[in-house]
Amino acid sequence: MHTLNIKSTKELKEFFRYKGKNTPVISGHRGGMVKGFPENSIETFENTLRHTPAFYEIDPRLTKDSVVVLMHDATLDRTTNGKGKVSDYTYAELQQFRLRDPEGHVTDYKIPTLKEAILWSRGKTVLNLDRKDVPPEMTAKILTECKNDIIMITVHTAEQAKFYHDYNPNWMFSVLVKTEEAFAEYVAAGIPYSNMMAYIGPENKPENKILLDMLHAKGVMAMISAAPTYDKLPNAAERAENYRETFAQGVDVLESDLPIEVSEAINDRR
């Protein structure tokens, strides 16, 4: 298994620090989407790590009885053999359902809890918690209970980042930064450069160079998400070329539904 051997928050910050010429970093969007393996499942996280080192963007959601599970959609219909809203079921009731793979086939895998995922990730990878319907206070409490600070939290505003930073100054953030002004707001809120990785959008545009240079000057890595763009290209060769080009243009982290493909693409040309 290709693990990310990160043992402390100091090592976590060092891993995500821009150092001039970085090794490309791969983020599996919802863990990755491969036949036989459902999104947002521990089994999928493990499968991806069999092929490539990666960290994962995941989607925490609340059940009816306030258990936090992993589920992107507000409803069960697309990714499980259940129907209706996640929030209409207790955690115990959700255990009757099984997850579907990207092609819609029902697997043997159950819906995991956020706690299960965080505890599993220790010594293996980093989980990046996206924002869904879980109150920040509850997220912070669960992270504290799990005693695993080797995590990342997606935030869309400086105010959101400040809440978590005040709660635990060790936590890393994936910050939404599409302009220099947006980045300045995080800095003004007291978020250290070392606690940030910047998500700059779904494609690498020429006008991003100024933003990339500014982030890199502060030691902050920049991430592009290929899920809504390059991942949708019709064939593997086109996708591979765009993955390689994204890194060649200075992006440090590529988030993708197809992390194994990304790894194969960039390793073919080294």
List where the protein language model places each region:
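Phosphate-group recognition and catalysis centered on beta-loop-alpha active-site segments
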Residues: 1-270
